[in-house]
Amino acid sequence: MSMLPTFGFTQEQVACVCEVLQQGGNIERLGRFLWSLPACEHLHKNESVLKAKAVVAFHRGNFRELYKILESHQFSPHNHAKLQQLWLKAHYIEAEKLRGRPLGAVGKYRVRRKFPLPRSIWDGEETSYCFKEKSRSVLREWYAHNPYPSPREKRELAEATGLTTTQVSNWFKNRRQRDRAAEAKERENSENSNSSSHNPLASSLNGSGKSVLGSSEDEKTPSGTPDHSSSSPALLLSPPPPPGLPSLHSLGHPPGPSAVPVPVPGGGGADPLQHHHSLQDSILNPMSANLVDLGS
């Protein structure tokens, strides 16, 4: 263990100081310590020093320097998780500044696709939502047997997957929510399908496109054609008024020339106009006699 020239610490001691200051969150003090290190190439290639430089660059917003450090040196797997977080968070922050709004899940996914992790801090295994496929496989296998793991089981799963207990809990909660939503959607579609198959009226309406209660356009009276059925047939087919009382229709609305004459049985081929006048006389004469009686 040799002392560094013109410096009071060994390389191992420098690495230890960097780790302690990082874990304690003393980023400003860590930055000053790194600045005080001598210009020794061997020292500055130490992995703990490089990781400390990356942390300081991130907190100072010097993302270009951060990317340069992460891409230029091969880091040990036990440091990958920490450095991957720095890489992704830095790109998220830059994207949010560029767009002027916070990123959602889709936006973060697009950033990850656009700026994949460098192989210097990534073992090449595909990740999903920052979970390795091996971890997801373990969680899926456990979920198939028990969707509600106990706190002790969650701790065991966290150790087996390299995740935190909170990450394991959130994964199971999100998976249960997705499954419940899928089941509700499938149940709704099944109910709609059953209701349509058991309703013949709805099926006939959907098939023919016409209402069962509606009539066709050909059965309706054409516009502009006079409707004789509302006047003279109603008058002619109504029962005659009792003796001594005038007809209500004859007082207010005497039949006009549009009235349709009704053939008199046994009349043969009588003139319709002559029959029309005789019909008027048969209605008006009793009324006139009644008026004379009332006047006397």
Swiss-Prot record:
GO terms for biological process: anterior/posterior axis specification; cell migration; cell population proliferation; chondrocyte differentiation; condensed mesenchymal cell proliferation; embryonic cranial skeleton morphogenesis; embryonic digestive tract morphogenesis; embryonic skeletal system morphogenesis. Induction: Down-regulated by CTNNB1 upon differentiation. Activated by TLX1 in the kidney and repressed by HOXA2 in the branchial arch and facial mesenchyme. Residues 168-284 are annotated as: Disordered. It is found in: Nucleus. Residues 254-264 have a biased composition (Pro residues). Residues 179-190 have a biased composition (Basic and acidic residues). SUPFAM superfamilies: Homeodomain-like. Residues 191-206, 228-237 have a biased composition (Low complexity). Disulfide bonds: none annotated. Disruption phenotype: Six2 knockout heterozygous mice not exhibit any obvious abnormalities. However, Six2 knockout nullizygous mice die soon after birth. Expressed in phalangeal tendons, in smooth muscle and in head and body mesenchyme. Gene3D superfamilies: Homeodomain-like. Residues 124-183 bind DNA. One of its GO terms (cellular component) is nucleoplasm. Its main location: nucleus. InterPro entries: HD, Homeobox_CS, Homeodomain-like_sf, SIX1_SD. Transcription factor that plays an important role in the development of several organs, including kidney, skull and stomach. During kidney development, maintains cap mesenchyme multipotent nephron progenitor cells in an undifferentiated state by opposing the inductive signals emanating from the ureteric bud and cooperates with WNT9B to promote renewing progenitor cells proliferation. Acts through its interaction with TCF7L2 and OSR1 in a canonical Wnt signaling independent manner preventing transcription of differentiation genes in cap mesenchyme such as WNT4. Interacts with TCF7L2; in a canonical Wnt signaling independent manner; prevents transcription of differentiation genes in cap mesenchyme. Interacts with OSR1; form a strong repressor complex with TCF7L2, TLE2 and TLE3 to prevent the activation of Wnt/beta-catenin target genes in the cap mesenchyme. Interacts with HOXA11, EYA1 and EYA3. This is Homeobox protein SIX2.
